[in-house]
Amino acid sequence: MSEDRTRDSYNSGKSLRILVVEDHSETLQALSRLLSHFGHEISVADGAQNAKNMIDSKEFDVVLCDIALPDGTGYDVIAEAKRKKPVKAVAISGFAATEDIERGRRAGFDFHLAKPVDFHELRTVLGQIAA
């Protein structure tokens, strides 16, 4: 299968502008490469303040955000993002108990993915957002 056909099979909708916020460099790189391969436009931030600066300077369709960041929380990042413009928010977190997911929803997250991120689940969520 050609790379273009592979990319098309993974990108089940329009190309999205995605901000990935993750302090673990290997996870950040893996998500960035994968999402680029899916055909999305990716920006990255390694902490809450970097993410807020990017949100101030650029528009995003989706913010894919870790909850526990060294200089703040994903909850703060999403609150800032949603004040600027309606954006879909996807939590990526090692905290995946029912109460964690509910807290995320109350804070503004539309979806919650547990770490390690299941790439098929991520693709499904992005497909729902892009539809």
Regions found by a protein language model. Give the residues of each.
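Non-catalytic signal-transmission and effector/linker regions of two-component phosphorelay proteins
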Residues: 1-19, 120-131
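Conserved acidic carboxylate
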Residues: 22, 69
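Two-component/phosphorelay signaling modules centered on CheY-like receiver
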Residues: 25-43
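Acidic, metal-coordinating helix/loop segments flanking the phosphotransfer/catalytic sites
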Residues: 44-62
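Acidic catalytic/metal-coordinating carboxylates
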Residues: 47, 73-76
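Active-site residues of response regulator receiver
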Residues: 66, 93
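Short amphipathic alpha-helix used as the core "switch/output" element in two-component signaling
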Residues: 75-87, 126
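Alpha4 helix (beta4-alpha4-beta5 surface) of REC/receiver domains from two-component response regulators
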Residues: 76, 96-111, 124
